[in-house]
Amino acid sequence: MRFITKITSTLIFSFGLVNAASYSVDNVHTNVGFSAKHMMITNVKGEFKTYDAQIDFDEATKSFKTFSANVNTASVDTGIEKRDEHLRSDDFFASEKFPKMTFVMKSYESDGNEGKMKGDLTIRGITKPVTLE
């Protein structure tokens, strides 16, 4: 679950926002990437190709009013198809049974420069609270 937290925080903070408004993430200019330990020796990097997110951000207060994201688990791509198939299997994401992972923000706190977003992350039908920094 730790690397999924990095995925979501990368999605949230990897694009610039300008005025108070509601946004849909532009998949051309953002990505949902991850890095995970492999055999405790190296890191495997990858991304999810299909996702969407809805954001309501207030530039004046530098705060998120709402944030939610849906990631298609079958769109995982590490550059090695055999590994991707394994990640889609019941051993990991169980993409056929659980095609989406979701994050829904519950609260956001900021000191003006950095922020912490608390919310619920759901993977394989299991929801856990996480804090993104």
Write out the residue ranges for each language-model feature.
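Low-complexity, acidic/polar, glycine-enriched regions of mature
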Residues: N19-E133
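Sec-dependent signal peptide recognition
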Residues: R2-T10
